[in-house]
Amino acid sequence: MRDALARLKAQRIIEVGGGIGHRSAWLYDLFTEDGFTPERYDIIENGAKFAVILHRLMTRYEGESYTKIVVGVLDALVGETLAWKAASSTGLEVGDAPIQPEADAIIVDGTNAQRAKNVELMLPFLAPGGVLFTLEPDMPVGDVEPEDVDGMELVNGFNAWIELIQSCNETHHIGFMPLFGGTLVAMVRK
């Protein structure tokens, strides 16, 4: 992913699911080593505790001028941003959007059960020519009993993923790259 972003030189980046900052550290290192700094880098994280870690990482790499750490539930942030976009299209001054309304590169992480939903939420934020990166959710194996809550979440998440790929196949170019530990998926609007 780091290499792909190095080639893209994306000016506007959104990372969904910053966690404790492993991937963010790779990206900050890229910005530092390549001398390439994006216009804006939004890191969305559901938990405030992790946001503290991300803030420390941001200050260590001196990314305050271009980084926005956003804490909140993705569904709500997307809804608020779409409402902001509609309100600002009327010409009214409505402040800043919770997350940037368009990005050249979007990285979507999250649980296997939520990954398809998160990708679907973020696709409208993809700029023309932009790339959305995610990992394919784990595929369920064997029989899963209906009482197995975790197993059923995995099955339902994977089924939602298959439905998403089928529907996006009409509107996006989709590439799959098997890697150690999973399959990287890239989506570009047709």
Residue spans of the language-model regions?
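C-terminal substrate-binding/active-site "lid" region of AdoMet-derived donor-dependent transferases
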Residues: 99, 112-190
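Conserved SAM-binding loop of SAM-dependent methyltransferases across substrates and taxa
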Residues: 20-38
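Local beta-strand N-terminus motif with an aromatic residue
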Residues: 10, 102-104
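S-adenosyl-L-methionine
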Residues: 47-101, 113
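Class I SAM-dependent methyltransferase Rossmann-like catalytic core
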Residues: 1-11, 25
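Conserved beta-strand positions in the Rossmann-like core of class I SAM-dependent methyltransferases
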Residues: 42
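Conserved class I S-adenosyl-L-methionine
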Residues: 9-21
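A conserved beta-strand element that flanks and buttresses the S-adenosyl-L-methionine
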Residues: 107
